[in-house]
């Protein structure tokens, strides 16, 4: 999809979706960055960074990675679920400060953190989809 198509979907859906997820008090900025690759060489659909103390987030979407509207909406929800889980970012940032230097302990904790966060987001997505069918 091109940037304008993805932007149109996001502009239409983000506010109602944030309200449904209980995060409409957050300020979420969205940008569109094509062809971003993750550490494993896979094309990224989206990414979310959060400033939990300020209820502020930035979502970056890769328009070229989407084939259709359901794909855009799934990724948008996924990134917004990271905002829902943002209070746990305090734990992550505290551990980062406590472990000044890189090393095996930090690598293990980073791995556990990433896995736990992504699994929690996937579970929220499943919950959301099942609740939507009940509406």
What residue spans do the PLM features occupy?
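Active-site recognition of the HExxH zinc-binding catalytic motif
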Residues: 74-87
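Metalloprotease/metallohydrolase-associated module, dominated by Zn2+-dependent proteases
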Residues: 1-70, 87-135
């Amino acid at each position: 999809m091109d940037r304008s198509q993805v932007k149109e979907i996001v502009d239409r859906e983000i506010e109602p979706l944030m309200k449904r997820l209980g995060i409409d008090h957050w300020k979420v900025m969205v940008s569109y960055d094509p062809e971003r690759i993750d550490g494993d060489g896979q094309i990224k659909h989206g990414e979310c960074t959060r400033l939990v103390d300020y209820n502020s987030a930035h979502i970056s979407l890769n328009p070229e990675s989407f084939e259709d509207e359901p794909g855009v909406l799934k990724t948008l929800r996924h990134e917004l679920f990271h905002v829902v889980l943002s209070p746990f970012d305090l734990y992550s940032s505290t551990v980062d400060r406590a472990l000044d230097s890189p090393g095996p302990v930090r690598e293990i904790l980073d791995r556990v953190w990433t896995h736990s966060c992504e699994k929690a987001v996937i579970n929220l997505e499943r919950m959301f989809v099942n609740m939507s069918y009940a509406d």
